[in-house]
Amino acid sequence: MRVGRILQADLDALPQSVSETVDYIDSLQRRVAFSYLVDVLSRRDHSTKEIQDKLKGQGFSPSSIESAVEKARQSRYLDDARFASYFVDERVRRGWGRIKIEQELQRRGVDPAEIPGYPEEFFDEHSDVERAAALLARKSIPENKPFEKLVRHLMSKGFSYSIARDAVQQRLCRDS
């Protein structure tokens, strides 16, 4: 669509032969794909898979997508390690647990094992229990089956059962 608009605006620039026209359109599509990619990345960082999906959704050809992604990587506009590191830091600040963060990274096409220093630099058992306890501090204790409901709540936030259990036990003992 974007390429078509540019072509329509500048019909005089089209070469006369078919092969030259095809090459011209292919070149134009690659430039437009890269321009769109930079525009998307100017708003926030994305993973390579997210960018590829966005470009595909805009109707760019696979070769244009590949070219734009490669150019963005070489220019360091697109960096999965940087994206993943920022993503994990941000989600930890929001109170997400390790399991939920890993699932979300995989959904976004990033393998957590490829993140430098993951998980040691981002998580430790003590801080996980503290973050889980902080989430519970904002939640009222249900009257019916409080242990099960609070553990389920923490597990839905991505905390392991053992961390959720410890945090809930601390909260219930403190408030009893």
Task: Give the ranges of each region predicted by the language model.
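An alpha-helical, amphipathic repeat domain used for nucleic-acid recognition
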Residues: 1-176
